[in-house]
Amino acid sequence: MLGVTYKGVAFPLLFTMLDKRGNSNWKERTRLIDRFIQLFGAECIDSLVADREFVGKEWVEYLNNRRIRYYLRIKQNFWLRNPKSCQDVRAWHLFHGLKLGRERVYDKLFLLKGEYVYISGALLKNSDGVPKLQILICYNRPEEAVATYKQRWQIETCFRAMKSSGFNIEDTHLRDIDRIARLTAMVCIALAWAYLVGEHKDINVKAIRILKHGKRAKSLIKYGLEEIANVLLRPLYKPKFDVFKFLSCT
């Protein structure tokens, strides 16, 4: 799935259903990027971020050749080669002694599986509060790697909304891949609809309550989804605005 990040949420644009377990391979990912470029143009891509499952020689080579700016997380035990000294080193070794909350950027190129990349990293706490080393590779602008990669959490917001905290797409227990694809496409549209409705209601009708830690009591997507459900399922409900106008591009 390929999405665009916007105000805390990654909105799905394109996806491919895979009739297998595990992650996509590099050919499947490149076909998805090629579809995006054909539809929207390469100039629309500011940068691409992806987690550790989406790293490989052919994939990085494809992004380098296409000159697509990317920030990919790699595993700590990956081997990197200094092209000048021809010495190999584990990725984690380059960040030995890094303090919590700090980042380190290398302004020289390393070889990762034969591809030239820049290396950046930071020692940050994960969602459980445990310090974890985050090592990133990129094609250019390594000084922006850590800050840009933080946008990746927005895809988790999207998946959470599609699954447990919104549409509960997994509860359908569908197995036919074509039906799953059609359902996913409908949910992608509904996700954007719910977000726009929730955003409008939050700004113009009633703001979502802010909790002590500074976050909203519920997401804009869930807020919008509740409003849409009220309009569709409660005949006596009197909405303060027309939720259906957000389905129009005009």
Give the ranges of each region predicted by the language model:
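Short beta-strand scaffold segments in enzyme catalytic cores
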Residues: 1-3
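Single, function-defining residue in the core of a domain
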Residues: 5-250
